[in-house]
Regions:
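Short, solvent-exposed aromatic-acidic interface loops
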Residues: 47-51, 102
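Extreme N-terminal tail/first-helix region
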Residues: 1-17, 145-147
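Charged, gly/pro-rich active-site loop segments
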Residues: 2, 75-147
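A short beta-turn/loop motif at secondary-structure boundaries
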Residues: 25-27, 70-72, 116-120
Length: 147
């Protein structure tokens, strides 16, 4: 599925997202994350060995809500499936790219310290095939009518 250009522009301008992964039949886990895309796949970068990495391996379906960086009432809900998990050094490079984009410096360290010197746990990238995009556009706030 093709991602809307407005969504790609929001991501390029440092939109944040909330991801939801399924823990079990009764529980869902949510996280606020940085987000990226490649072509028409959503990319999520996370530390290997986290609870959410276990969740996604048990149930690869995922929901991602991406908030417009200048208007939190404009957002996109992405429903999709994690189709590929990248676990090589490119995932570490990718988190540095995201950290530079979002915060102006490499991930969790100064520019003169390498990934290996910092002793960080390796990263992984989830490549999400998008099945559905629901756009929610900001509109003037009004009182809700009683149901």
């Amino acid at each position: 599925m093709q991602l809307p250009i407005e969504l790609k522009q929001a991501i390029d301008n440092n939109a944040f997202c909330a991801i939801a992964t399924k823990i079990n039949e009764k529980e869902v886990q949510n996280h606020l994350m940085w987000v990226d895309y490649r072509e028409d796949r959503i990319l999520i970068n996370t530390e290997q060995g986290r609870k959410k990495t276990k969740n996604i391996r048990q149930e690869p379906n995922i929901s991602v809500v991406i908030f417009h960086p200048n208007d939190m009432y404009t957002c996109w809900e992405i429903r999709g499936v994690v189709e590929n998990i990248v676990q090589d050094s490119s995932a570490n490079d990718h988190i540095d790219y995201l950290s530079n984009r979002y915060s102006g410096k490499p991930y969790g360290r100064s520019k003169d310290v390498t990934w290996e010197e910092a002793g960080f746990t390796s990263r992984e990238i989830w490549e999400i095939d998008v099945n559905k995009v629901i756009s929610m556009v900001s509109r003037a706030q009004s009182k809700s009518e009683p149901e």
